[in-house]
Amino acid sequence: MKRKKHVLHQILSEKRKAERIRGGNMSAKDEFGTTKYIIYAEFEANGVVERPDVVGAIFGQTEGLLGDDLDLRELQKTGRIGRIRVEVHTKAGKTYGTITVPSSLDRVETAILAAALETIDRVGPAEAHIKVLRIEDVRATKRKYIIERAKEILETLMEEEIPETQELTEEVKKAVRAKELIEYGPEKLPAGPHVPFSDSIIVVEGRADVLNLLKHGIKNAIAVEGTSIPETIIKLSKERIVTAFTDGDRGGELILKELLQVADVDYVARAPEGKEVEELTKKEIVKALRSKIPAEQVITEMFHKGKNFYEILKEKERTAPSKEVKPAPKHEPKPQPVEQKPREEKIIRPIQQAKSPEIEKFEKFIERVKKEQTAILLDENMNVIAEIPVRDLLTTISTRDNIYAIVFNGIITQRLIDIVSENNVRYLVGARKANVVRRPVNLKILTFAE
C-alpha cells in the first residue's frame, strides 16, 4: 500500500513539473499578477507531513519574528505577498518538497522574508530544514518575454505591411509623376516640367518614355509623339542643346534619322539594342546618356559610311582609352590643343582657328566637359572645386562660395550671367551664347570658339 502511495506521489510530482515547463517563463505573470519577486525554497522533514502542516509552520514560526510590518498574515491580507504554494512528496519515511512565495515587497524586505523561512526548524511533529534556492525577479522575466514577443510581432508586421506600403508608395509616385508631366507647344507634346527653361533637353519618342525619365529624376525630356517631327522640336533644337534618346529597335533608328535631317541635334544616345526607353532602369538610362555621341560624328558615320549607331558606339569605346592617355601625361602644357584640333573638327562643331590667350588656360577643362553634359567649377588656382551635371549648375552656384571660373558644355543665357555675376564669378566659359544683352563689368564671358 505504501509503495502504491509513493508511486502516485511521484506521478503527481512529474505531472506538475511538466505543467510548469510548458507554462514557460510567463507562468509567474499569469499566476501572481503584480508580483515583483518570487522566493523559491526547498524543505526536508524527518517524518511524514502534509501541505497544511508546512503552511502552518511558515505562518506560525515567523509570527512576531520580523515585527508587525513584515508579519506574513498581515502582508497576505494587504496583498503584499501572494498565495504560498507548497508541493510535497514522501519517500522512505521522509517528506520532501518545494515552497513558492510571491512577493510585492522591495528587494531588501523580500530577502529578509526569505531568510526568515530558513529559521523554521519543525513542520508538524517532525524536525525540518528549509533552504532558499533563489529569488526570481519577475520583472526581468517579463522584460525578456516582451522583447521576444515584440520580435515576433514586428516580423509579422513587416511580412504583412511592407508589400502593401510599397504598393501605396508606388501609386503615390505615379500620381506625382503624372502631375509633373506638362503639355508643351501648340502640338501639346508630353514633356517634363524643366523643358520650358532648361538650357538642354532630351528628345524621346513617346509619353511613356518621358514618364520613365521622370520616375528616375530626369525632368527635361520631351516626346515627338510619332514619326513626323513636330515644329516645336525643330524650333527648340535651334535654341537648346539637344540630345536625341531613342529606342534600341528599328523604329528608334528611323526616328533618329529623321531628327538628324530636320532638327539641330547636338548629341545622340540610344537604349540598349532590343530595349525601349520606357522600360529602362535608372542605371541603364544613366549609362546610355553618358555614352552619347556627338551628332556630327553620327551623321558622318551613319549617312556617309553606312554604319549604324551601335557600331559607332563600339568603335568609340575601343578608341576612347588611347585618346585619353596620349594628351594628358606627355603633352599637357602646349601640344595638347594642337593634337586635339583635328579630332574636334570631326567630332565637335567647327572651331575658329584663332584662340585667345584667356581661353587657352581653360582648354583642358573644355575638353573634359565636351565629352559629357557637365560643368566644372574652379577656384583662383585653377583647381577643380566640383564637377556637376549642367542641369544642377544654377542651384550649385547659389550654395557654393569662392567660385572663380565656370566651364560648362551648354548655352550661356542672360539668366545664367545674372546669377553668376551676383556670386562674384570672374570667368564664364560655355559652348555658345544666346540672347545676351547685358554684360557685367566684373565677369569675363568666353565661348569654346573664341
Swiss-Prot record:
InterPro entries in the record: DnaG_primase, Primase_DnaG_arc, TOPRIM_DnaG/twinkle, TOPRIM_dom
Binding site residues for Mg(2+) 2: D247, D249
GO MF terms, alphabetically ordered: DNA-directed RNA polymerase activity; metal ion binding; poly(A) binding
Keyword annotations: DNA replication, DNA-directed RNA polymerase, Exosome, Magnesium, Metal-binding, Nucleotidyltransferase, Primosome, Transcription, Transferase
Domain Toprim, residue spans: 199-273
Annotated coiled-coil segments of the chain: none
Keyword Ribosomal protein in annotation: no
TM region(s), chain numbering: none
GO cellular component assignments: cytoplasm; DNA-directed RNA polymerase complex; exosome (RNase complex); primosome complex
Reported cofactor(s): Mg(2+)
E.C. designation(s): 2.7.7.101
Any Pfam family the entry gives: Toprim_4
Region described as Disordered: 320-350
Keyword set includes Ligase: no
Biased composition (Basic and acidic residues): 320-348
Cofactor note text: Binds two Mg(2+) per subunit.
Annotated positions binding Mg(2+) 1: E205, D247
Disulfide bonds: none
Function: RNA polymerase that catalyzes the synthesis of short RNA molecules used as primers for DNA polymerase during DNA replication. Also part of the exosome, which is a complex involved in RNA degradation. Acts as a poly(A)-binding protein that enhances the interaction between heteromeric, adenine-rich transcripts and the exosome.
Family: Belongs to the archaeal DnaG primase family.
NCBIfam families assigned: PRK04031.1-1
Quaternary structure and interacting proteins, as annotated: Forms a ternary complex with MCM helicase and DNA. Component of the archaeal exosome complex.
HAMAP family xrefs: DNA_primase_DnaG_arc
Descriptive protein name: DNA primase DnaG
Source taxonomy: Archaea, Methanobacteriati, Methanobacteriota, Thermococci, Thermococcales
Gene encoding the protein: dnaG
